[in-house]
From Swiss-Prot:
Residues 19-148 form the C-type lysozyme domain. It comes from the Eukaryota. It catalyses: Hydrolysis of (1->4)-beta-linkages between N-acetylmuramic acid and N-acetyl-D-glucosamine residues in a peptidoglycan and between N-acetyl-D-glucosamine residues in chitodextrins. One of its GO terms (biological process) is defense response to Gram-negative bacterium. This is Lysozyme C. Disulfide bonds join 24-146, 48-134, 83-99, 95-113. Keywords: Antimicrobial, Bacteriolytic enzyme, Disulfide bond, Glycosidase, Hydrolase, Secreted, Signal. The gene is LYZ. It comes from Papio anubis (Olive baboon). Lysozymes have primarily a bacteriolytic function; those in tissues and body fluids are associated with the monocyte-macrophage system and enhance the activity of immunoagents. Its main location: secreted. It is found in: Secreted. Pfam families: Lys. Lysozyme C is capable of both hydrolysis and transglycosylation; it also shows a slight esterase activity. It acts rapidly on both peptide-substituted and unsubstituted peptidoglycan, and slowly on chitin oligosaccharides. One of its GO terms (molecular function) is lysozyme activity.
């Protein structure tokens, strides 16, 4: 009985951590999922975006108190416009997806939603981190040495 209690406490203390991609691993994955050149956006720009939005972490979340929305996953996709978390007032859910799907180690759903985001007129400029850290910069370093 004591062993069961100890095992239970150990399991409760384990924290959930999503996949944190290595830079080149992410570049290869994004290429395989069709982001290289999608809507004219280079693979290097996508990797730069993921670096500055989530530090390549699939479990990253960020709450925005102003509109009570949350950004989810490797691309920090917002619950007000793009996904449904069941909590954000007036959510649109333009990607027709649960926000939890954007936190998976398999980033196929996140990529599909990111493609939807950049299909809007604002394109990749929808991401503040991309505008602040990647736009009009040499982003080739983000895929350098990755063989992509």
């Amino acid at each position: 009985m004591k062993a069961v209690i100890i095992l239970g406490l150990v399991l409760l203390s384990v924290t959930v951590q999503g996949k944190i991609f290595e830079r080149c691993e992410l570049a290869r994955t994004l290429k395989r999922l069709g982001l290289d050149g999608y809507r004219g956006i280079s693979l290097a720009n996508w990797v730069c975006l993921a670096k500055w939005e989530s530090d390549y972490n699939t479990q990253a979340t960020n709450y925005n108190p102003g509109d009570q929305s949350t950004d989810y996953g490797i691309f920090q996709i917002n619950s007000h416009y793009w996904c449904n978390n069941g909590k954000t007032p007036g959510a649109v859910n333009a990607c027709h997806i649960s926000c939890n799907a954007l936190l998976q180690d398999n980033i196929a759903d996140a990529v599909t939603c990111a493609k939807r985001v950049v299909s809007d007129p604002q394109g990749i400029r929808a991401w503040v981190a991309w505008r602040n850290h990647c736009q009009n910069r040499d982003v080739s370093q983000y895929v350098q040495g990755c063989g992509v």
